[in-house]
């Protein structure tokens, strides 16, 4: 199938699993972002399944327990890894963006949040934000139900830490609640997108050549030739 690739603002969406995926829960977030001419990336559900299985084995590492549980979850994860490899290969072979394997995802939050933080989406949410930033999706909407304490810790609470590590990260947490107006939610997202669009256009406008440089003078440091 012919594909026309044009520069677009790339936006990743993370958050509490229901609000993240459900158009009813997030006021048609994907449709809204696409209406703003964005390329939208929702990390897949496979990672959450692997995360749940991984946590069972991690509990044995942190707190002890039956070795059979650890062995069983490791075997299950190995099977999931084989399924994941086939999925990622199908995506990349077709020319689509594919995330890294789960084994790499587990390493990303280390030094930022403990793998023992597994309330709700836990460390997975933080890891997904880091992976999105590293993959070029530095504009991120963190969708959460109003008053969701786990999300305030592993999502909203990690934003400053991620920004310290990746200054280009443009993350906005959005609370979804029946009492929250859709207009306010969309206006906050539009503010984030305004920053993203400025950055998208910046390389075109940056470092124009002077008349002297065009004649043959030496370009200044940082100038585009």
Task: Write out the residue ranges for each language-model feature.
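An N-terminal assembly and electron-transfer interface module characteristic of large anaerobic redox
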Residues: 1-225
């Amino acid at each position: 199938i012919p594909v026309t690739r044009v520069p677009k603002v790339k936006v990743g969406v993370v958050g509490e699993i229901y609000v993240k995926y459900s158009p009813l829960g997030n006021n048609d977030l994907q449709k809204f972002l696409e209406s703003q001419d964005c390329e939208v990336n929702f990390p897949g559900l496979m990672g959450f399944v692997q995360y749940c299985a991984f946590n069972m084995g991690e509990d044995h590492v942190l707190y002890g327990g039956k070795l059979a549980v650890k062995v069983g979850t490791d075997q299950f994860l190995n099977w999931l890894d084989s399924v994941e490899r086939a999925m990622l290969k199908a995506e990349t072979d077709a020319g689509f963006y594919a995330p890294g394997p789960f084994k790499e995802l587990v390493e990303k939050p280390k030094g930022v949040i403990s793998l023992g933080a597994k309330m709700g989406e836990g460390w997975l949410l933080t890891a997904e934000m880091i992976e999105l930033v590293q993959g070029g999706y530095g504009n991120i909407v963190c969708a959460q139900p109003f008053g969701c304490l786990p999300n305030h810790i592993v999502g909203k609470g990690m934003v400053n830490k991620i920004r310290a590590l990746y200054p280009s990260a443009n993350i906005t947490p959005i609370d979804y609640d029946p009492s929250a107006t859709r207009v306010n939610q969309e206006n906050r997202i539009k503010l984030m997108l305004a920053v993203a669009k400025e950055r998208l256009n910046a390389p075109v406008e940056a470092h124009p050549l002077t008349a002297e440089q065009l004649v043959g003078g030496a370009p200044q440091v940082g100038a585009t030739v």
